[in-house]
């Protein structure tokens, strides 16, 4: 990986970063262990929802992506929160290396991974052409020996993915095909997370991609206010939560963010109101922030918590016992 040099000296690994990420300064809080994500029996089982409260996590994107910078970005946010994230969100291309050094670092600190695994053409998958590769990925996940959330081809309802997904029926067939290969490989440590966009429930596009109750462990949505004007978290997620309420499944908000364009004080108010929505809906069992500014998106599509007003509101949420249920296992 460019910008990352690992030197082993006296059994210690020293990471030299040539493209350093300018992370926020530590708050001085004591760093505590990650609140543990529960499993049914042992660490090699799939993660299960907490009986009370909700897991809290994030994708923390550095300005310049390297493995070292990703680790530093997560570490910096955790220093400010005062404890490790229960869930660390990572993104994985269809045939990318796995696990990465950052994946292993997050697992080693006691966090659980939410792996957003990108797809390929759904009809290619169901043809069997990629079966060997899918088996390889299944063995990689199994070999971790730790619980993970696995989110295959998230936001599949987006119009710009239609040439790859083709239709809801094609997507469901590909999902079932992948799950069958994982089951045959004996992968028991992955909870399968189905995660379209929240917008897909207001425009009616998402439901056609649902694989069915027997094939999904967690129902999820990525929730961002639409471009142009102000939209609350509640108005963004309400259609999704209404749909999810008809299913006996734990709910995850896999990504959410408040645009930088709103300004510091409105962002803080938006976050505090979002917390109230989550706490009031006991079906929501995991909440993950998208702490990044994607390239070329402008202020309306940037969500990183760089201003102290919004960051303070965010930290007050992350610090609440409701979002640290693992401590009460």
Residue map of PLM features:
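Solvent-exposed loop/turn segments at secondary-structure junctions
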Residues: 63-65, 93-96, 119-123, 154-159, ...
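N-terminal carbohydrate-binding/catalytic regions of secreted carbohydrate-active enzymes
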Residues: 56-147, 266, 270, 276-282, ...
């Amino acid at each position: 990986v460019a910008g990352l040099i690992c030197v082993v000296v006296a059994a210690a690994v020293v990471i030299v970063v040539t493209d350093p990420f300018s992370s926020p300064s530590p708050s001085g809080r004591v760093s505590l262990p990650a609140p543990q994500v529960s499993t049914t029996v042992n660490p090699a089982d799939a993660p299960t929802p907490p009986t009370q409260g909700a897991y809290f996590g994030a994708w923390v994107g550095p300005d310049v992506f390297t493995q070292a910078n990703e680790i530093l970005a997560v570490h910096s946010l955790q220093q400010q929160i005062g404890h490790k994230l229960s869930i660390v969100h990572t993104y994985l291309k269809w045939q990318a290396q796995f696990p990465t050094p950052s994946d292993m670092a997050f697992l080693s600190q006691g966090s659980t991974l939410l792996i957003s695994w990108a797809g390929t053409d759904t009809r290619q998958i169901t043809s069997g052409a990629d079966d060997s590769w899918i088996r390889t990925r299944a063995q990689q996940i199994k070999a971790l020996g730790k619980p993970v959330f696995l989110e295959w081809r998230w936001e599949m309802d987006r119009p710009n993915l239609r040439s790859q997904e083709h239709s809801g029926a094609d997507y469901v067939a590909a999902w079932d095909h992948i799950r069958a290969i994982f089951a045959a490989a004996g992968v028991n440590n992955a909870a399968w997370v189905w995660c379209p966009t929240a917008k897909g429930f207001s425009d009616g596009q998402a439901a056609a991609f649902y694989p069915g109750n027997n094939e999904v462990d967690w129902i999820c949505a990525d929730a961002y206010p639409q471009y142009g004007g102000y939209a609350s978290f509640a108005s963004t997620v309400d259609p999704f939560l209404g749909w999810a309420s008809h299913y006996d499944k734990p709910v995850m908000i896999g990504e959410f963010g408040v645009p930088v364009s709103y300004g510091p004080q409105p962002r803080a108010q938006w976050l505090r109101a979002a917390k109230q929505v989550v706490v009031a809906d006991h079906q929501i069992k995991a909440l993950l922030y998208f702490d990044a500014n994607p390239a070329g998106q402008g202020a309306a599509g940037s969500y990183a918590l760089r201003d102290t007003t919004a960051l303070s509101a965010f930290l007050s949420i992350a610090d609440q016992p409701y979002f640290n249920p693992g401590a009460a296992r």
